Amino acid sequence: MVRIRLTRMGKRHMPFYRIVVVDSRKRRDGAYIESLGYYNPLRKPAEIKVNVERAVEWILKGAQPSETAANILSKAGVLAKVHEMKYGKREKSDEGVS
């Protein structure tokens, strides 16, 4: 199974993470298929940079994000874009308004 997850980079006590597409059987910092961006939790606010087009493409192909990666991709707007592409835009209805 192909997963989207984080791989740790940086030096001791100063981590940052790459968001990568990887075979789920590989080790955490092992070889990956493609790098989609990075996440730096030490910056305030946390710095997130993601190639949205490639991330959407991988998710539509069936790549499963890890729980942490899913939270980061959600903040970057990737999961909302995937939902919109799969199911269309949500329409507001006036049925409940009297």
UniProtKB/Swiss-Prot annotation:
**Which Pfam families does the record associate with it?**
Ribosomal_S16
GO annotations under biological process?
Answer: translation
Which PROSITE patterns did the record assign? RIBOSOMAL_S16 (PS00732)
- Key words, A-Z: Ribonucleoprotein, Ribosomal protein
Q: Gene Ontology terms, cellular component aspect? A: cytoplasm; small ribosomal subunit
Q: Name one GO molecular function term.
A: structural constituent of ribosome
Family named by the database record: Belongs to the bacterial ribosomal protein bS16 family.
Please give the PANTHER family that the UniProt record associates with this protein. 30S RIBOSOMAL PROTEIN S16, SMALL RIBOSOMAL SUBUNIT PROTEIN BS16M
Q: List, alphabetically, the HAMAP family matched.
A: Ribosomal_bS16
Listed name of the protein: Small ribosomal subunit protein bS16
Q: Which organism is it from?
A: Pseudothermotoga lettingae (strain ATCC BAA-301 / DSM 14385 / NBRC 107922 / TMO)
